[in-house]
């Protein structure tokens, strides 16, 4: 069925735009569009916004309200919002609204400002925001919901857009289309296909990278040996679903948490390349708006890096940017350490910042302030705390429990007074500044690949966006209860005798045989390997292209600078198509992070820019030939021609 613009009274303008994806970013884009509509629409003009998502609008699929209450956000309630505030630098009007905490307080949900809400609770907030946006839409603006997937997008002869839905319905005559999708499925690579085929042939289970909320775990039997490959946020989701999600419970004792099994749990084994779980987030002591204000990453420094990148002399992340990140982190660590020991800070900050990273002068400053070698910051010790040791099975288990207990203890000291967690939280607080530097080809292709994608981004995730402290405490209790074991670094899963034998080369003698292998991670954004029909259609027809930096494909959908127009295979930016969010990862950095109040959230300024550009397209008239903008080509140095660096911390 084809849906086109209906007839309107003579002299009345009726424009149509579409937003594909109605999770947090799509909902934010809709809110921003409604906020700015009166800046663009003439008196009496009409605008219909078509929102396209098979899941309930607002929450979308990831944050849907019909998911297990065992699944938590990893951000405290007071630091989550979908509304602009006075801190947000954007062209559109500021329309303040409640944060998740303020909304939950009004709704009497009993959530404290520093508690971690469930994902379903956040979904309820998002659905409420969507309803409020619809209810308060300005005169002449109406929102039409399409519970469907978008499967293709094409130009009409008059330059407007035609969007085809999975229901067979076609929306034509669209003046603008905004893609605001979240995490999308991928076509499995050869290695994953091989594992799945082996599982099918032997009556095993292989669960590919997925959102745990989307996975049917009911076939896992009590006591069945299961290996979870990955110790990040997805691991903790599976851990919860397979324990308290099956009727087990935790109780508090003087010695910590104790787990009381239901008898329905599988026997879980876990591991990752690093061998240890993401570090617990420090208990929040910063309130809703508190953050580390950059000491080194000033506007002048950021502008300097950008000017170099824009002139074709992009900086090297490891050599030029990383030392500054490290200096910011270490400054906060040492100041908190000195306060913890009752020392006066005096001129410590000025002297420490005046020295070069890892220099003899820096070490002398630490000596002058009485900071011993034992208490000095070590990225090696933090990223690989077991060093080069190998362990027996029993020694590894004992070491792991002690490590987890220490991590929980450090987290309890908070992200202000606890030296370790205060320092690691700096990495989270600096995300906006780093985005300004590295986004849109801010690094060379080689540095983007080896230093950012393959090294710093995983390190940043491991250290600064981990689970709440309670998850680490639960993990300890599950190990003590014999429900869970961590196998060690660099685990290998070998197919043999109709099952998988899993072991770590660094814990000799510890081998387990499992019948279910769970890839405990989300699929990485990859335009070339996406299973999303809409993006696949655009790629196959040359209407979009993968983002590249000096020949290195980052995996993201290529877009321009703000307002993020989609670029086709010929390097032309489409005037009526825009994209924000996870599919653009690579062009932008850490796109999965949500909006936070009071800190000029880039998510909100991005959706504002896209919304206003879409409105501009809606009122610009319908030309027979759509104008497209040629995008500047960057110097193309093939990554294959450059020697790969081995990067350590």
UniProtKB/Swiss-Prot annotation:
Its cofactor is FAD. InterPro entries: FAD/NAD-bd_sf, HpyO/CreE_NAD-binding, L-asp_N-monooxygenase_NS-form. Keywords: Monooxygenase, NADP, Oxidoreductase. Its EC number is 1.14.13.248. Pathway: Mycotoxin biosynthesis. It catalyses: L-aspartate + 3 NADPH + 3 O2 + 2 H(+) = 2-nitrobutanedioate + 3 NADP(+) + 4 H2O. One of its GO terms (molecular function) is monooxygenase activity. Disruption phenotype: Completely abolishes the production of 3-nitropropanoic acid. SUPFAM superfamilies: FAD/NAD(P)-binding domain (SSF51905). It is an enzyme of class 1 (oxidoreductase). It holds the Pfam family NAD_binding_9. Nitrosuccinic acid synthase; part of the gene cluster that mediates the biosynthesis of the deadly neurotoxic nitroalkane 3-nitropropanoic acid (3-NPA) that acts as an antimetabolite of succinate and irreversibly inhibits succinate dehydrogenase and disrupts mitochondrial oxidative phosphorylation. NpaA catalyzes the iterative oxidation of L-aspartic acid to nitrosuccinic acid (2-nitrobutanedioate). Alternative amino acid substrates such as L-glutamate and D-aspartate are not accepted by npaA as a substrate, showing the strict substrate specificity toward L-aspartate. Belongs to the nitrosuccinic acid synthase family. PANTHER family: BLR0577 PROTEIN. This is Nitrosuccinic acid synthase npaA. The gene is npaA.
């Amino acid at each position: 069925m084809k849906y086109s613009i209906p007839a309107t009274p003579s002299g009345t303008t009726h424009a149509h735009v579409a937003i594909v994806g109605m999770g947090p970013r799509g909902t934010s884009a809709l809110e921003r569009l409604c906020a700015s509509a009166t800046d663009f629409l003439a008196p009496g003009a009409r605008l219909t916004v078509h929102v396209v998502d098979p899941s309930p609008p607002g929450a979308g699929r990831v944050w849907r309200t019909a998911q297990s209450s065992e699944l938590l956000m990893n951000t405290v309630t007071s630091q989550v919002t979908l509304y602009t505030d006075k801190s947000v630098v954007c062209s559109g009007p500021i329309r303040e609204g409640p944060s998740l905490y303020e909304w939950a307080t009004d709704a009497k949900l009993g959530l404290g400002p520093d508690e971690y809400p469930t994902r379903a609770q956040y979904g309820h907030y998002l659905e409420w925001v969507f309803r409020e946006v619809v209810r308060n839409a300005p005169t002449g603006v109406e929102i039409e919901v399409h519970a469907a997937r978008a499967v293709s997008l094409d130009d009409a002869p008059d330059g407007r857009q035609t969007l085809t839905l999975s229901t067979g319905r076609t929306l034509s005559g669209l003046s603008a289309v905004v893609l605001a999708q979240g995490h999308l499925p991928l076509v499995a690579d050869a290695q994953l296909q091989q594992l799945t085929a082996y599982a099918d042939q032997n009556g095993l289970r292989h669960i590919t990278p997925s959102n745990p909320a989307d996975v049917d775990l009911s076939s896992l039997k009590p006591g069945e040996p299961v290996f979870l490959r990955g110790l990040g946020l997805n691991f903790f989701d599976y851990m919860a679903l397979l324990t308290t999600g099956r009727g087990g419970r935790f109780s508090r004792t003087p010695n910590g948490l104790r787990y009381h099994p239901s008898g329905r749990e599988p026997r879980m084994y876990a591991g990752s390349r690093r061998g240890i779980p993401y570090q617990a987030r420090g208990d929040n002591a910063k309130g809703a708006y508190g953050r580390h204000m950059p000491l080194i990453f000033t506007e002048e420094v950021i502008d300097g890096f950008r000017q170099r990148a824009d002139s074709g002399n992009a900086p090297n992340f490891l050599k030029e940017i990383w030392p500054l990140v490290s200096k910011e982190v270490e400054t906060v660590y040492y100041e908190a350490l000195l306060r913890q020991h009752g020392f006066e800070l005096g001129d410590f900050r000025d002297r420490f910042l005046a020295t070069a990273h890892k220099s003899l002068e820096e070490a002398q400053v630490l000596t002058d302030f009485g900071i011993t070698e034992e208490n000095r910051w070590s990225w090696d010790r933090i990223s690989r705390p077991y060093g080069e040791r190998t362990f027996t099975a029993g020694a590894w288990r004992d070491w792991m429990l002690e490590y987890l207990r220490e991590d929980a203890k450090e987290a309890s000291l908070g992200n202000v007074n606890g030296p370790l967690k205060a320092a690691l939280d700096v990495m989270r607080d600096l995300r906006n500044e780093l985005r300004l530097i590295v986004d849109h080809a801010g690094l060379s292709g080689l540095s983007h690949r080896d230093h950012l994608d393959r090294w710093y981004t995983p390190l940043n995730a491991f250290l600064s966006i981990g689970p709440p402290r309670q998850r680490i405490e639960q993990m300890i209790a599950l190990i003590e209860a014999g429900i869970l074991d961590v196998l060690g670094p660099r685990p290998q899963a070998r197919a043999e005798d109709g099952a998988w034998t899993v072991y770590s080369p660094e814990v000799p003698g510890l081998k387990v045989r499992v019948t279910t292998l769970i890839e405990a991670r989300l699929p990485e954004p990859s335009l070339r390997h996406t299973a999303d029909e809409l993006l696949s259609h655009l790629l196959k027809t040359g209407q979009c292209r993968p983002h590249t930096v000096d020949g290195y494909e980052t995996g993201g959908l290529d877009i321009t600078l703000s307002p993020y127009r989609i670029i086709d295979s010929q390097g032309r930016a489409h005037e009526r198509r825009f994209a924000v969010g996870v599919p653009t990862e690579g062009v932008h950095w850490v796109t999965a992070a949500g909006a936070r109040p009071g800190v000029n959230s880039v998510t909100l300024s991005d959706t504002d820019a896209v919304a206003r550009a879409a409105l501009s397209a809606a009122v610009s008239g319908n030309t027979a030939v759509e104008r497209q903008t040629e995008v500047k080509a960057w110097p193309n140095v093939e990554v294959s021609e450059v020697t790969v660096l081995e990067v350590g911390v």
